[in-house]
């Protein structure tokens, strides 16, 4: 499955079910850089996922969300 399809069809529903503050999850690629964007009501979080497979993207994004949530409290 392509990364963009994975992020939009699998990762986005999972993350939005886990956190009501997440409005959308998107994937973007410019040149060799790949990012997952998590959009909240007051902004967004961009996570560099270059070179990762779908499982790696899921793990990294969840770890970053947990770390981001802890630092905001």
Regions found by a protein language model. Give the residues of each.
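Negatively charged, low-complexity tracts enriched in Asp/Glu with abundant Ser/Thr
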Residues: 1-21
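Mixed-charge, Lys/Arg-enriched low-complexity segments
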Residues: 2-8, 56-73
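Intrinsically disordered, low-complexity peptide-like regions
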Residues: 6, 17-19, 33, 39, ...
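Short, flexible helical or helix-coil boundary motifs
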Residues: 14, 18-29, 64-73
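Compositionally biased, low-complexity segments enriched in small residues
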Residues: 18, 50-53, 62
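Acidic, low-complexity, intrinsically disordered interaction modules
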Residues: 23-56
